[in-house]
Amino acid sequence: MVKLNGNPGEKGAKPPSVEDGFQTVPLITPLEVNHLQLSAPEKVIVKTRTEYQPEQRNKGKFRVPKIAEFTVTILVSLALAFLACIVFLVVYKAFTYDHSCPEGFVYKHKRCIPASLDAYYSSQDPSSRSRFYTVISHYSVAKQSTARAIGPWLSAAAVIHEPKPPKTQGH
């Protein structure tokens, strides 16, 4: 430990006492000029452009760009990817939205079908499912082709051709 009350002018006036545990060392010592300046080097090395040949070799080749240069591009591409995911999610939800059907209809197989048809075909055997899909498709075609409501059990041809009035025997 160093005792702070020591005066630099009193170098040898008092011998250090071991009893108190402190040494009196001056904190500021005079500087000598010989220690301040280093001798000038005899040989000076000047770096020229010829020492940097590895950079010149890579000029013709493709250099990998730094990530810092493309920070904005990366952020924009991530934002576009995020927006694309949002758009796909909205479109998916729009297509798979649980549609509400009017009273007396049941939503099955992405269509609203009459509840009576559903009850009739669900009570039959499992092989009737193909007929069930056929009836649904005929129902949709008939609904699109005519202006009035048609039952799915009627064929489209029977509805389009109305029965002719009976001929009278008079003429």
UniProtKB/Swiss-Prot annotation:
Top-level taxon of the source organism: Eukaryota
Disulphide linkage map: none
Cellular compartment(s): Membrane; Golgi apparatus, trans-Golgi network membrane; Cell projection, Dendrite; Endosome membrane
Topology versus the membrane: Single-pass type II membrane protein
GO cellular component, one term: early endosome
Residue intervals annotated with topology Cytoplasmic: 1-71
GO MF entries: clathrin light chain binding
InterPro entries: NSG
Entry keywords, A to Z: Cell projection, Cytoplasmic vesicle, Endosome, Golgi apparatus, Lysosome, Membrane, Signal-anchor, Transmembrane, Transmembrane helix
UniProt-listed Pfam families: Calcyon (PF06387)
Transmembrane stretches, start-end: 72-92
All ranges on the Lumenal side of the membrane: 93-171
Protein's GO biological process: clathrin coat assembly; endosomal transport; regulation of postsynaptic membrane neurotransmitter receptor levels
Disordered: annotated segments: 1-21
Similarity section: Belongs to the NSG family.
Protein's recorded name: Neuronal vesicle trafficking-associated protein 2
Organism: Rattus norvegicus (Rat)
Top-level taxonomy: Eukaryota, Metazoa, Chordata, Craniata, Vertebrata
